[in-house]
Every structure is written in C-alpha cells, then in structure tokens.
Amino acid sequence: KYAKKPFIVGYRFSPEEFETPGIRLEDTIWLLERLRETKLDYLHVSLNTYDRVAYSEKYADKTILEYVHETLQGKIPLVGVGNVRNRQDVETVLANAELVAIGQQMIVDPDWDVKMVEDRDAEFVTKPFEEAYQELYLPSPLYNFLNMRYQPSK
C-alpha cells in the first residue's frame, strides 16, 4: 500500500528442523500448497546443501529442493541455495529452482560471480569452506561466528 511499485515480497523458509518435535517436510509441503496460491513474488528455501534429502523415509527418494519445486507447480519462483560452489552446482540447482542464491562461496571467493560470467571456472576457490575462510582477513565478529559454527565435532 505504501511502497512504490515494483516492490517484491518473498518468503524464506526452513523445510525441516533437526529438533523433535519440529517442522518436517510433510508440514512444509502442506504450507507450500497454500503459499503457491498467494501473490508472493518468490519463495526462498533455506538449505545447508542443495542436494539434502529429508529425514523422513517417505520423502527420501528425491532431494528436498525437488519436492519443494514440484509442490509449487511453477506458480511462484523458487530460490534454491545450499553449498553452491561451481557451475555444475548452479546448473543442478536451476533444474529445480528459478533462481540460485550464493552465500558462503561469496565470502571465500568475492569475485566468484565475475569468474562465473567470464567462464573462469578454473579460478574458483574450491577448498572446503571450513578451511577456506580461515585463510581470509575477516572482521572479528564474522570470523568468530564461523569458527564457532564450523568447529570440529567431538
């Protein structure tokens, strides 16, 4: 009502939670069946890796991204995300999403988008993210957050 057009509105969601009880893919599919009938401009699925499979055996035959994209039936554009590091990852995500979000890779390889457009794939930072960020001069809060998030499992 108060924003100038065009003003896009989207919704980012987590398809599953690790906790019990928590959101399960079945719950998310129920929600998406309703959201696809709204006037949202896009949906953005939150995934740590784009090829993640649901916890439920009922949904183990495809990736979560595939289930989400199928459920939307092309009615709302989907933003896919999750450990997208190279051209093949982008192409794989685009098979089940209209847009791709790049997060961690842009931290360790800030020119990644330029390299992608200019077909300089050989220059992509390919070291695992958990190692690559440690070689950068990052602001202390970001570095400390990443260190806390990626500390080795005991």
Question: What is the predicted function of each stretch?
Answer:
Residues K1-K154:
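Flavin-dependent oxidoreductase catalytic cores
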